[in-house]
């Protein structure tokens, strides 16, 4: 008799294929679920593989459009950067994947969900917090945290032997000496030879971006139009190409940014579970959009509002990274950020060239930039004499600080 029905987040790779068979060995019926979030994957082959391994059903879900609109766009509005550098490509994808996983579980009457995330990483937290937030009654089977599983499979060699024994198709190409995770927003690389933070990334590691040294000698000049803080159109200023749907916009910017080697970073970051890890990331389209959004936002947003919004962006980044997308605090922050974008509207022109994004100009019907007010040639409503009082008022605390420091110094010299 079956122990119950499990929806497995299935990739078609060695790990989750072995997990699928292992779950069946444990007495579960398994539904294999594959999320298309823009990775390079032959989904028909993966479907046939899952069916051959005994999956009761296989669901392949195209989540690319909702990934862009419901996850990438809110992160862009917030200028979300974890620890000032990481654009959160993996972190944003996990709640998108897990949300559909629990939807399938609820629809199919499954009591369990399962994933192949390791017991040392962030993804286990992100998957499971999403599952519990959206389907509180669900039970999670995390094989890499179950002693019977991880003691049995201590490495790739054990998985390969298990696969051979159970007629699981195995990769015919040598495994790269690092792990890789890809989606529409980015590709991440970690583990293996990259675990030594001193090791340079091999030149053949990068798949989404060209080496800037070998990128075209001719820049691509683009215009990106924003409304309420999200891009609604991107146009090439020379060849006339224009994209308007969210998915088309993002894919096109990935193409242009990747061609010029934009968006590569190599960092050591702080995982939520307490350890530091090294990650190498390629995020071409996201990097182009971040620079454009920063520019139009500063152009149209009040200074003090933006200061508050910046602090919310930092908190939002931490919540995303740590797996709290569907928490009440993250919902609150998203709503605040969305409200801040009400007047973030206009066009930014930029150049993409050899690993860099150069802002060329901007215009907006809701700009707070007053050319006459700021001009050195026109006095306008601003009286330069008023600056004297402004400076004196701001100097009061500096003078008081100096007085205190002087008194302390005098006592020290006695």
Swiss-Prot record:
Pathway it works in: Amino-acid biosynthesis; L-arginine biosynthesis; L-arginine from L-ornithine and carbamoyl phosphate: step 2/3; Nitrogen metabolism; urea cycle; (N(omega)-L-arginino)succinate from L-aspartate and L-citrulline: step 1/1
Binding site for L-citrulline: 86, 91, 122, 126, 179, 188, 269, 281
Gene3D superfamilies documented for this protein: Argininosuccinate synthetase, chain A, domain 2, HUPs, Single helix bin
InterPro entries reported in the protein's UniProt record: Arginosuc_syn_C, Arginosuc_syn_N, Arginosuc_synth, Arginosuc_synth_CS, Arginosuc_synth_type_1_subfam, AS_cat/multimer_dom_body, Rossmann-like_a/b/a_fold
Keywords for this protein: Amino-acid biosynthesis, Arginine biosynthesis, ATP-binding, Cytoplasm, Ligase, Nucleotide-binding, Phosphoprotein, Urea cycle
GO annotations of cellular component type: cytoplasm; cytosol
Function: One of the enzymes of the urea cycle, the metabolic pathway transforming neurotoxic amonia produced by protein catabolism into inocuous urea in the liver of ureotelic animals. Catalyzes the formation of arginosuccinate from aspartate, citrulline and ATP and together with ASL it is responsible for the biosynthesis of arginine in most body tissues.
Family in the record: Belongs to the argininosuccinate synthase family.
Xref: PANTHER family: ARGININOSUCCINATE SYNTHASE (PTHR11587:SF2)
Protein name (database record): Argininosuccinate synthase
Species of provenance: Danio rerio
């Amino acid at each position: 008799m079956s122990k119950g029905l499990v929806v497995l987040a299935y990739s078609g790779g060695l790990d989750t294929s072995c997990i699928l068979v292992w779950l069946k060995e444990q007495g579960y019926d398994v539904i294999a679920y594959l999320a298309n979030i823009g990775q390079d994957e032959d989904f028909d082959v993966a479907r046939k593989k899952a069916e051959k391994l005994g999956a009761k059903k296989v669901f392949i879900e195209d989540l690319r459009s909702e990934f862009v609109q419901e996850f990438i766009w809110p992160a862009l509005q917030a200028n979300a950067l974890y620890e000032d550098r990481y654009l959160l490509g993996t972190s944003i994808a996990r709640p998108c994947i897990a949300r559909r996983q629990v939807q399938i579980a609820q629809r199919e009457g499954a009591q369990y969900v399962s994933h192949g995330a390791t017991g040392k990483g962030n993804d286990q937290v992100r998957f499971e917090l999403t599952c519990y937030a959206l389907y509180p009654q669900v039970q999670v089977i995390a094989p890499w945290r179950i002693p019977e599983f991880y003691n049995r499979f201590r490495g790739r060699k054990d998985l390969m032997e298990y696969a051979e024994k159970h007629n699981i198709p195995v990769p015919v190409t040598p495994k790269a000496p690092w792990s890789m995770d890809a989606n529409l927003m980015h590709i991440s690389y970690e583990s293996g030879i990259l675990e030594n933070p001193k090791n340079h990334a091999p030149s053949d590691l990068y798949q989404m971006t060209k080496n800037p040294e070998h990128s075209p000698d001719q820049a691509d000049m683009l215009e990106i139009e924003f409304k309420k803080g999200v891009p609604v159109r991107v146009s090439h200023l020379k060849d006339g190409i224009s994209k308007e749907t969210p998915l088309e916009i993002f894919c096109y910017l990935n193409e242009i940014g990747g061609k010029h080697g934009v968006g590569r970073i190599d960092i050591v970051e702080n995982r939520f579970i307490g350890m530091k890890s090294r990650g190498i990331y390629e995020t071409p389209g996201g990097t182009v959009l971040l620079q454009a959004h920063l520019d139009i936002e500063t152009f149209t947003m009040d200074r003090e509002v933006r200061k508050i919004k910046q602090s919310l962006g930092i908190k939002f980044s931490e919540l995303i990274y740590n797996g709290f997308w569907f928490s009440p605090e993250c919902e609150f922050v998203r709503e605040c950020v969305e409200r801040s974008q009400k007047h973030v509207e206009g066009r930014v022109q930029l150049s993409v060239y050899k690993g860099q994004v150069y802002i060329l100009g901007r215009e907006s019907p809701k700009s707070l930039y007053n050319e006459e007010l700021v001009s050195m040639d026109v006095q306008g409503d601003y009286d330069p004499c008023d600056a004297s009082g402004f400076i004196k008022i701001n100097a009061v605390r500096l003078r008081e600080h100096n007085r205190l420091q002087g008194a302390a110094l005098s006592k020290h010299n006695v």
